[in-house]
């Protein structure tokens, strides 16, 4: 558990409740979220949005678009509750509506990253963001 907390803290600059998002990505993919997704493509981790380089990067693009729809809380900082039940993410029912939305955005990106593990390409692990092409609209 301590390792997950350290990984989440290292995700500084990544949008979303860092601790929850990092844990979800690890639980769904088995991958270290900082090492594998912190600088991946044009949309994962820190940096601006750009045209996705592959399906993995598209997951992060959709995640950032999901956050743009959130109102009433700060998806970058505000924490929410969720549980891991039978290998599935369950957003807490006691979360206020805004944080429920943030949790669902984070859940969706974690599942998307798992579903697209086959498209993950180590050559995109560290992408120079200013070389990314203009992003599509959400």
From Swiss-Prot:
GO terms for molecular function: calcium ion binding; calcium-dependent phospholipase A2 activity; phospholipid binding; toxin activity. Residues 1-16 form the signal peptide. It comes from the Eukaryota. Residues 122-133 are annotated as: Important for membrane-damaging activities in eukaryotes and bacteria. The record marks 129 as: Cationic membrane-docking site (MDoS). Gene3D superfamilies: Phospholipase A2 domain. The keyword Chloroplast does not apply. PROSITE patterns: PA2_ASP, PA2_HIS. GO terms for biological process: arachidonate secretion; lipid catabolic process; phospholipid metabolic process. The record marks 128, 131 as: Hydrophobic membrane-disruption site (MDiS). Expressed by the venom gland. Homodimer; non-covalently linked. This is Basic phospholipase A2 homolog G6K49. It comes from Calloselasma rhodostoma.
